[in-house]
Amino acid sequence: VAAHAAADEHRRRAEQAEAAELVADFVAEARRRGLPPERLTATGHGGRGRYRTRLRGWYVDRARSRAVDVAGRFHLLVVPGGLRARLFGADPQPSPAPLVIGAGGRDGESVPLRTLLRRRLGDAD
């Protein structure tokens, strides 16, 4: 069991490193192309309300629920809402980027991170 856990951890770290490299390459290419970062907003759980954040970066999906900030960190832009978030803004924390977005989701749709990032760069052409 310990060997399986170690192998899973090794695989997870390798995937996170590969995804981090894809994100870093995306930021460099977006800057090279002059794709301007924008102020990012977050959505409340359940899709209710939009909340300001202090983040600047690029949305990478049409739902505007995932983004890469100017520092090259991946963010899932879904936050608990509430009065505090409405008044002071939300503070979504960065998370490791997955290599496949939506893997294991109920709708069965999944998209490789590389594809999402390429599409976003294609929007700038």
What residues fall within each predicted segment?
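Generic structural motif recognizing short loop/turn segments at the entrances and edges of beta-strands
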Residues: L35-E38, R64, G72, S95-L99
